[in-house]
Amino acid sequence: FSPAYTDYEIDEIAQCSSHLVFNSLSQFNRFHLQSKQANSNISIGLRVNPEYSEVETLLYNPCAAGTRFGVPADKLPQQLPADIEGFHIHCHCENDSDVFERTLQHIEDKFSPWFKQIKWINFGGGHLMTRKGYDIKRLVSILQKFKTKYPHLKVILEPGSAFAWQTGSLVSQVVDIVEDKGISTAILNVSFTCH
């Protein structure tokens, strides 16, 4: 997934991918045929926005007002374009399964009318499954109930930071220091927000 693709990279990305998710209908319309020509086996999806997230830090909340991430339900056509095979929803950040359960209700409320038209659903990352105290049994139960309701949908969960959680140190380098109005800021060669 990327919020936007460009002409000079889409062929290479499609050739290296089994799935390709577009962030908007305009990106889908611009690149889906080119992606299919580059890789006839690629499965194309669309990032959708359930307009609900319990992420408290606005910087990390992809459902905050004015977001650039995903298509809300009221912007989707009743009949999806034939090449859209899946939905991608990413609206968690270090959350537990209780948050996923509440979020899933919003996802179903908004997007279940299209579930018959797709083959897979990617619930994104941000599920901190490896954190001590994470309720794995609850997550499994939630996913089993969902699969019972929608047996044709392949469910995808991204590992995200959960698999690197507390596994080592982040090593970076100060590459510059900028000053503005008496505030000095170190510019590092790593990103605080990788998404």
Where are these regions (language model features)?
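Active-site-proximal beta-alpha core segment in soluble small-molecule metabolic enzymes
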Residues: 1-120, 142-145, 187
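C-terminal active-site-proximal or functional interface alpha/beta core segments in diverse enzymes
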Residues: 91-195
